Amino acid sequence: MDIEVELIETGGRESINFFPNKRSRAFEPLYESLVENYSSLNRESIPYQRPSILYVLPNNIGNLLGTVEVLMDWKRRMGYEVNYVSSSAIVNNANNLKNYIETAYEAWDNPPEYVTIIGDAEGSYDIPTHFENWSGYNGEGDHPYATLVGNDLFPELFVGRLSFDSQSHLQTIISKTVNYESNPYMGENWFKRAALIGDPSTSGVSCIITNDNIKEVLQNHGYEDIRTVYGGDFPSQMTNNLSDGLAFFNYRGFYGVSGYTSADVGDANNGFMLPIATVITCGTGSFGTEESISEAFLRAGTASNPKAAVASIGTATLGTHTMFNNMVDMGFYNGALV
């Protein structure tokens, strides 16, 4: 049976004035997930750029630059081209910083695929973030730094933030990151272990259903020890599971994280058995004015005795909604593993 499909477009088409000269391998998994039969394309003749990272540093980085250079040197050894900017005229103004990133993306021979902001959005080592003005909550976030071409919300590169407020924070974060990638703790099978926490008391049973979905994804990808916490003393159970060492730590519940605070994060005793923490509920990613619990996960411990997590994902503002949080949560694990 033959099927013929005719596509008729209506309406105007946005004019895109820029296309990169070379394709980024970092986006290949996304294309494969979105484009039917993408794997059947012959990509041997496609020119790909060299992997590239741009670090954005506070203008007063001073003698802390040596700490950051440990991370930059490791990335170079991994094969990345590494650049950084710390000019006060650029990093102290969100619009100027976005313009700099956009110029780098469009004009550099080897543009950045990743932009890592090293600094808090407030405090002694601040680099501004963006605040949206359409929800009424003034939510902060760095995503606008990645939307460089067109009027859509799709990113042209990957952006993240290593948020620190002190020399100790920075040393801890760099130690966590470099050791996680270059010298992971191999003493036991912690990297096949996960803890999934769902509190239905306010946001409803969908928090448990979300975690059950994530559990199935993890099981399908070889995770052998998956702990679920759906009731009882949430803070103590979260601390105990973190201390055992995890690959993933996931929370779905309501504002306040079921009584688990930034101070509780520091009670974990997991050393270099550091998970990626996804704490998807109101306020967990509100880093614009004070320390959020996501920042606490990243900063906890010391360079030689780290705690909590190597990375953390949260959501900003007190105006998030259960159904959307559930989708973000399940979507992360589907995107990371599937």
Which residues does each predicted region cover?
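Cysteine-dependent hydrolase recognition
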Residues: 1-338
